Design a protein with these regions (language model features):
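Glycine- and aromatic-enriched mobile tails/lids
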Residues: 1, 5, 22, 37-38, ...
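FAD-site-proximal beta/loop scaffold in flavoenzymes
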Residues: 155-170, 175-177, 314-356
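An anion/pyrophosphate-binding glycine-rich loop and adjacent beta-alpha core
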Residues: 37, 210, 216-316, 382
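Short beta-strand to alpha-helix junction loop
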Residues: 75-86, 119-137, 148, 198-205, ...
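Conserved redox-cofactor binding core of oxidoreductases
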Residues: 94-174, 186, 230-233, 253
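Glycine-rich loop(s) and the adjacent beta-strand/alpha-helix scaffold that form part
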Residues: 182-236, 240, 369, 373
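N-terminal Rossmann-like FAD-binding beta1-loop-alpha1 element of flavoenzymes
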Residues: 7-31
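Conserved N-terminal glycine-rich FAD pyrophosphate-binding loop of Rossmann-like flavoproteins
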Residues: 35-66, 70, 225
Length: 458
């Protein structure tokens, strides 16, 4: 591994991969990931990815996104995401992503909660895996990209230029400083600090902890999304998501008596509240979701969900399955502008790590992959433009002036790493207090709705 790169990308989900693919091919790029390369939440996305089908859908797409976000979204970010969606989809298709098509070869669109029309492209019920695996395969072909798994970011290196690199802990446990012209944080959300989450457990908000110590601004850190339907289990570990597209295709929620009790296509936070109320009313630990009302062949439309439920003892073609809300997504994050720049020079953030305000207080279903791709590309293009303006020679000079940390600096770096470990403990304690987290978050939403029921938004 080199000590100097043009860019270091932390994370190899869709945001990290898309950024790497849009940086100059002559640039030296290092990508690191804390676990295996396929252990990103991007791989877990089931439902699909939104796209602006045609100009006539713009107003509705915009309104659906704003409405789901309680009108706390940043309008500019929403506009950029929607306007950029078709170009992103065309790129994905060019890179081999296989979206579902009809018998005439036309793209198929599905609908999910809080969408006023069908505008979501999908690949069975493993859309995230399809997109991320194809992008990752393209990244691995690039000779200018070094990809290291089981390599953890412990801190950033800062100086007169702002962010000047990252401190990493390699696979052998050694602390290594890596200098770079620019750094992109694309290392996911915070689900790992919750007991009940659909996220991988190693996603523990690393960038947020570092941002706090480095005075990099955060935004909307109290906005955590609870997904209404995960497969209920008494086992510990990551919760299996039952995609929103299941309800979009016609599945219904049932109480303990087998009666439907809510509108399944409301925004996620509203459906989660309704499920919680019903569980308290029925004195149960879950509600039921029936897929028998779906007119399609569910085994063919949702093969991954069918197989997983079968492994847990449920045949979705014959019986309802137990579902319960769980932590799913983080709308907050490291504050960025429309080019994914943080408040520290030469430091960018994209994907769930960042907060550009596009989701507001609650994310609209299937906007996450799209947002990650759109703003990762914008980060890469902004970096490339600045490199072109400055010239690679300047970067080479910067590399030559960068020096190894002295002994006292190494002690400081090691101390910072110890502080980082304390941060994890603090965050775990915070999550423990927030068992509050799942149900109190829903109760707070109830209180918010009650206090603002006469308030007009927009």
């Amino acid at each position: 591994m080199k000590k100097y790169y043009d860019a270091v990308i932390v994370g190899c989900g869709v945001a990290g991969c898309f950024a790497a693919l849009h940086l100059p091919k002559e640039a030296d790029i290092l990508m690191i990931t804390k676990a295996d390369t396929e252990d990103s939440d991007s791989f877990l996305a089931q439902g699909g990815i939104c796209v602006l089908k045609n100009e006539s859908d713009y107003d509705a797409f915009y309104e659906d996104t704003m409405h789901a976000g309680h009108y706390e979204n940043t309008p500019e970010s929403v506009d950029i995401m929607i306007r950029s969606s078709r170009n992103v989809i065309n790129q994905l298709i060019a890179w081999g992503v296989d979206f579902r098509r009809d018998e005439n070869g036309e793209l198929c669109y599905t609908k999910e909660g809080a969408h006023s029309t069908s505008r979501i492209l999908f690949h069975d019920d493993v859309t995230g895996k399809e997109i991320t695996s194809k992008l990752l395969a393209q990244v691995k072909k690039l000779p200018n990209v070094t990809l290291l798994a089981h390599t953890e970011m412990c801190d950033i290196l800062s100086g007169k230029n702002g962010c000047e690199g990252v401190l990493i802990r390699d696979e052998e446990g050694k602390l290594v400083p890596v200098y770079a012209r620019d750094v992109i944080w694309a290392c996911g959300g915070i689900g790992g600090i919750y007991d009940n989450s659909t996220n991988f457990p190693h996603l523990t908000g690393d960038a947020l902890a570092i941002a706090i110590h480095r005075n990099v601004a955060l935004k909307n850190v109290n906005y955590v999304q609870i997904h209404p339907t995960t497969l209920y289990s008494q086992k510990k570990g990551r919760r299996f998501l039952i995609s929103e597209s299941v309800r979009g295709e016609g599945a219904v929620l049932l109480d303990k008596n087998g009666e439907r009790f809510t509108d399944e296509l409301q925004p996620r936070d509203m459906v989660s509240r309704e499920i919680h109320r019903q569980m308290e009313k029925d004195h149960t630990k879950h509600v039921w979701l029936s897929l028998k009302t779906i007119p399609l062949d569910v085994k063919e439309r949702f093969p991954n969900i069918y197989q997983k439920c079968l492994e847990e003892g449920y045949d979705i073609t014959k019986e309802p399955i137990p579902v319960v809300p769980a932590q799913h997504y983080f709308m907050g994050g490291v504050k960025v502008d429309s080019n994914s720049e943080t408040t520290m020079d030469h430091l960018y953030a994209a994907g769930e790590t960042s907060c550009n305000g596009v989701h507001g207080a609650n994310r609209l279903a299937s906007n996450s992959l799209l947002e990650s791709l759109v703003f990762a590309e914008r980060a890469a293009k902004k970096m490339a433009a600045e490199w072109a303006a400055e010239g690679l020679v300047e970067n080479a000079d910067r590399k030559e002036t960068a020096t190894e940390p002295k002994e006292d600096e190494w002690k400081l770096l090691a101390k910072r790493y110890d502080i980082r470990k304390e941060d994890y403990q603090d965050m775990e304690e915070y999550a423990e207090r927030c068992k509050e987290s799942i149900w109190d978050a829903i109760r707070k939403e109830d209180k918010y709705e009650s206090n603002h029921k006469n308030t007009k938004c927009g």
